[in-house]
């Protein structure tokens, strides 16, 4: 499940240099008063095991659902965004984030985790989820993040899991998988 909407909004437009602070503030942000939709609540309440990223927006999403994680692990945290100096531009953080993520996906990572390393982490995360699913009597819920959730989903499919339900990829949305 993708976490709820973070409370942090920050400035409407920032320079590329200011994006480092914006990203740090975003990573420290919880979900504030964001309320999960009923569909997310019912999915989450059906879970017999709950795993989570350690980032505040994931943990506060579980709190909004009145749930506690069984496991909190760095392996589930979002892939960091690199920041590239591009003087003279003031853009919305969303535009910068898309640009920086595309650069990252192209293998240009500067001083953050490389895409290949994140993919290896996704393999590890999928292995953890698969192990919990095999041991569990019910559903396993991961409260995670957009990019890492997609990378983990790819690895779950490679392990023989099949997606049988997808709400989308936005806040509070989830995809469900079964081992075939």
Language-model-detected regions and their locations in the chain:
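Active-site-proximal alpha-helix that buttresses catalytic centers in soluble enzyme cores
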Residues: 1-76, 94-124, 172, 180
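Short, well-ordered alpha-helical microsegments
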Residues: 58-60, 149-152
């Amino acid at each position: 499940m993708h976490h709820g909407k973070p409370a942090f909004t920050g400035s409407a437009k920032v320079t590329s240099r200011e994006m480092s602070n914006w990203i740090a503030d975003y990573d420290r942000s919880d979900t504030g008063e964001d309320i999960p939709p009923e569909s997310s609540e019912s999915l989450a309440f059906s879970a017999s095991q709950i795993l989570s990223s350690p980032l505040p927006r994931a943990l506060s999403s579980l709190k909004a659902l009145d749930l506690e994680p069984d496991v909190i692990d760095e392996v589930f945290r979002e892939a960091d965004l690199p920041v590239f100096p591009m003087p003279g531009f003031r853009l919305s953080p969303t535009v910068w984030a898309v640009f920086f993520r595309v650069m990252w996906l192209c293998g240009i990572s500067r001083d953050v985790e490389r895409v290949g390393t994140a993919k290896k982490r996704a393999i590890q995360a999928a292995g953890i989820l698969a192990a919990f699913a095999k041991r569990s009597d019910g559903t396993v819920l991961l409260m995670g993040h957009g990019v890492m959730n997609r990378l983990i989903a790819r690895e779950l499919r490679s392990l023989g899991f099949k997606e049988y339900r997808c709400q989308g990829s936005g806040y509070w949305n989830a995809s469900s998988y079964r081992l075939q």
